[in-house]
Amino acid sequence: MDINFSQNEARVIGCLLEKEVTTPDQYPLTLNALTTACNQKSNREPVMALDEATVLDTVELLKEKRLINDVSSFGSRVSKFQHRFCNTEFGSLKFTSQEFAAVCVMLLRGPQSAGEIRTRTNRLCTFSDVKEVEAMLDGLAEHAKGPYVVKLPRESGKRDCRYMHLFSGEVDVEALAAAVKSTSTAGLASANNERFAELEEDMKAMKLEIAELKELLESLTS
C-alpha cells in the first residue's frame, strides 16, 4: 500500500472522514473547524493540542499526496478542505459504510477491539452485533488490494484482541506478540515476588507472636 500516514496526517484524515458523515452541513471544513476537530477530547486517542499552523502544514503535505482538496470558491477568503482518501471519484479506495466507519475510528483512536468499534461507530453506521464487526474486519485484513487492517495479539489481562489500520505502515505482529508475552511473564514474576514478600512478612509476624506467647507462658509458670 502506498499510503503511510504520520500521526498528524492520520488525525487530519480521520477528522475529515468523521465530519463528512456526522456534520455534513459543515463539511468541507475550514482550517479552524479542522483544528478544533483534531483537538477534540472525545473520540480521540491521544488527545492532541495542534495549532492551526501545524494543521495547515499537515494539510499541505496531504495535498501534495493528492489526499486532500481545497474546495473554496474563487475569491473566497476562507479555505475549505475535503478528503480524497476513499469513496471519491479521485481514487480507487472504496469502502462500505461499515468499513469506512471502522477505519475512521482506528485513524482517530488507534487499535480497537471489535466491541469498541461497534460502540464507537454508532454515529457513523450500525452493526447488528460484534460478530458482524469481526467479519467486516477480517474482510479488511484479507482484502485483495490490502490488507488494510491487522489483528493484534491479545494483551495480558484483556479479553479481546484489538485491530489496527495499516495506513501508517506495517505492524510487526510477531514483535508485538513477543512483547506481550514478555510483559505477561514479567507481570507474573512481579506478582510472585510480591506474594513471596508478603509471606515473609507473615512469617516474621508469626515468629514474633510465638516469642511473645513463650514469654507469657514463662511468666505464668515462674
UniProtKB/Swiss-Prot annotation:
<protein>
    <recommendedName>
        <fullName>UPF0502 protein PBPRB0676</fullName>
    </recommendedName>
</protein>
<dbReference type="InterPro" id="IPR007432">
    <property type="entry name" value="DUF480"/>
</dbReference>
<comment type="similarity">
    <text>Belongs to the UPF0502 family.</text>
</comment>
<dbReference type="InterPro" id="IPR036388">
    <property type="entry name" value="WH-like_DNA-bd_sf"/>
</dbReference>
<dbReference type="Pfam" id="PF04337">
    <property type="entry name" value="DUF480"/>
</dbReference>
<dbReference type="InterPro" id="IPR036390">
    <property type="entry name" value="WH_DNA-bd_sf"/>
</dbReference>
